[in-house]
Amino acid sequence: MNIHFLYGTETGTSEMLCEDIRDDLDLQCEITSMGDFDASTLDGDTFYIFVTSTYGTGDLPMTAQPFYDAIASNKPDLSHVNFAVFGLGDMVFADTFAFGSKILMELLVDRGAKMVGERGIHDASSADMPEDIAVPWAAGILDIHRAAAA
């Protein structure tokens, strides 16, 4: 199974979290900023795990916005794409908590992509480190995806 992490970040936390998941689960995978990834190349042979923070008033980080905009404007059929989403947010901003991952997830599903499992979320105001939530979440998501692919 090909695994590709695509992240959106302002401060580097999402990228580091992808690396933590890869290392802790001993995955052979790619890790790429959404800002450096051509949305038209999403393929059905790869399982995509999106990790993104929320910026400003519930927006995607600047590194993820071009990816989002390309899908929103081109409206591709993504029915061949399987993905999961993990969002980083802060409940101090309860009205827009983890909205970056939410709006990305909604767009992908709207274009026909198949989401595996539930969206994972980390609250920066909690005592938990992001990797303490994301690593077990990712392990569960990968188990679900492997079982469905078998």
Residue ranges: model-predicted function:
Residues 26-40:
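A short, well-structured beta->alpha microelement
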